[in-house]
Structures are given as structure tokens and as C-alpha cells.
Amino acid sequence: NDYDLRRTIRGLVLSDAYARDSQWPEGERPSPVYFAVARPRPLTPNQYGSALVFAAADPEQLAKPKTPEDLAKRLADLEKRGENLAKRFDRPDDTFQVSVDEALYFSNSDQVQNDLLGEGGKLLGRVLKTEGLAKRLEVAFLNTLSREPSPEETETLNHYLAARNEDEKGAWQQVLWALMTSSEMRFNR
């Protein structure tokens, strides 16, 4: 095929194997010996630290770099901050469970409040500047989980935010905290 990568990639992407899902949709899961579905794995400390820092970043700061060098510098800075955050997390093993220390750190740490849930130059600031609740939820979900919210999630969060409209910033901090500490964020699927 004269090393036609476009043709090869197209063949892979359109294959039945590529179209399969790695999560079991319903019913009883098959035995692990069949390798029918992927096992969720916890992210390594560096992966999780970087994922949190990238999720907390203002998406507009990454969307419009002045030069490629500016973007590379910004990404390197975010990765370095992720490495610093990673020191707080346990290295996962086969029997990994989120530690009590990690849960308490996310619940009580000033670093989490300032670095991940702060307003200036962060996702929270961008969400609060965005017009319309649906668009705000979309920005929050795309930045943290790389997907749009489901209709059920949208309905639940609409009720949650409506009940806390007197402290909009605090309510959105809680929403972002919940997304960043969710199992969907912590585990590789």
C-alpha cells in the first residue's frame, strides 16, 4: 500500500474491533478471563496530578496561544504544577482504593481550594463568566471529563444549582470539586 497511513488509519477506525466499547452496557459482566471488557485502572499520581491541573485551567488560556512556543511553555508549566500535586497521591497497585488521606486532602486542603477551585485564571472563573446554565455545565464537563453532561446529570445539577443560587460561586466550586474527584476522573477507562 506504499505506506499509505491515511488508508491504514481509515481501515482501523472503520473496523468492528475499533467500534467496540470497553465498558459493559448492561446485564452480568463477563468473567475477567475472557478479556471482554477493560478493567478501569487508577491513574498514576503524575497522570492524576496533571489531569487535575489541566481540568482546573481556564480553557481559553490554552485555546488562543500567541505562538507555539507560548503554548509549549504554558503546557510545561501546567505539567510541572501537576507533578507537584502528584506528591500527595499514593501509587496505585492491583488492590487500589482511594486513601483516607487523599479524600481528606481534597476536602480540606487550601491548595485544592486555591489551585484547583480558585477563580483567577482558572476554570471556575471561566464558568462564572459564561452565559447560560447549559453552556456553563458544558464548559465544566468538557474541561474536566472531556465529554458533555448527560440529560440526567444536567437535570440533577440544574436542581442543585437552583437550590444554591444565593452562593453561586460556592455552588460551582462544589460542582467542579465533585467532577474533579469523581471516579470518572480518577480512573482510566
Where are these regions (language model features)?
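Amphipathic alpha-helical segments that form the core helices of the histone-fold
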Residues: 1, 155-165
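An acidic, gly/pro-interrupted, aromatic-rich
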Residues: 6-7, 14-150, 174, 179-189
